[in-house]
Amino acid sequence: RILQSVKHCNISVLYIKTDQQLLAQTQKLQQRATFHILQEYARSGVFEQIILVDNTSVSEMIGELSIADYYESLNQTIVPMINFINVFNNSKPGMSTFGPFADVSRIRTLGMVNVETGEEKLIFPRDNRNETRYYYAINAKSLKEDGTLHNKIRKQMKGKNEKSSFGIFETSYDKNFCYSVVCSREIVQL
């Protein structure tokens, strides 16, 4: 009944997968059921998208973390990614190859991309992708003075097995950075 009453709304779900080793058997079964059911709802269009996050993957991306600051550090990595992607989705890029996401591409995760090397680290491991969107946040100085930037980004887009698009957004930050949204139509199995 609840899902029927919100069917007309665009709902995005952020699913944070806890480390399986920290869960009791009943909790593992609950996580598995919830995880799969929410993905099926996203695939069927009940949800606009489900963004998958794996605390273990985020922890590995960050590096060594103290126990006292563990969850705070994870949150300080995840929240800015989501915030910047939301800001960029509502901003005009300086250059863009973005088109609409495919209707079937509702199971998603996020990544951080090294602007110089193109190395990508995802916050949830994904083998199967059908499209990826890259959000390059580039400072004004680099946009004006770096003659290699455009070719570097184009080169990073080549060789991708999935449909890839990018947007370049001007920022006032000293460092350039890039986030990715990785989409799939396939359910992730636990």
Regions found by a protein language model. Give the residues of each.
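Tubulin/FtsZ superfamily GTPase core signature
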Residues: R1-L190
